[in-house]
Amino acid sequence: ESIKNGSIAYPDNKDVISEEINYYIQNDKLITLKQTIDKEIDGGNADANFYFIRGYINDQIGVGSIDANGKKGVGKVDTAYLRKAKMDYLKTLELNPNSLDATFNLGVLHTTFGNYFYETASKLPYSETVKFDALKKLETENFNKAIEYFEMADGFSSLSNTERIEMYGYMKQLYGKTKQLDKIKEMNAKIDALRMQK
């Protein structure tokens, strides 16, 4: 309650606002947190971190980890929330081009989109050729965009070896899906080199 009073008394104090956000994270109240962040963004009082956190919440709703009410989700993809997450991550990068988290999460998000379009296309009847071709195009575009963001993330020195190996694993799968076999060999070599450093 003192945090809420503080944010009312000192609406321009980002330390108080950050403390309030941390409280909601620790108490698993993501939707309440999202409402708080929406208010700060609407009031013009938000930096890159606010957009990133809102993007993360929308991302979690989009992949079905939680529902729009903050309850445990059933794993159903909601592309509307994924698009909201994408816009927030892009705004994060606009305000802070050095945000590794936003860059990496955009790679994951585009992978999710690509997988969604793949699965949607695979369920179509054979007669739906035009729709199938359109979905396959979206699938490829998103996988290529995911690779682009992961390649950008690879340029950050703050990635640990473990995180980098995990990311190279994602990239290997994407290179396989986009039929870039030479790149798979390159990822295998990078993974082997990093494992030897452990």
Where are these regions (language model features)?
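Structural marker of alpha-solenoid helical repeat scaffolds
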Residues: 9, 43, 95, 156-160, ...
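Residue at a conserved register position within TPR or TPR-like alpha-solenoid repeats
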Residues: 24, 58, 65, 110, ...
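Canonical positions in the second alpha-helix
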Residues: 6, 39-40, 91-92, 153, ...
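Structural register within alpha-helical repeat arrays
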Residues: 20, 54, 61, 106, ...
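Short coil/linker segments at helix-helix boundaries
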Residues: 60-84, 112-149
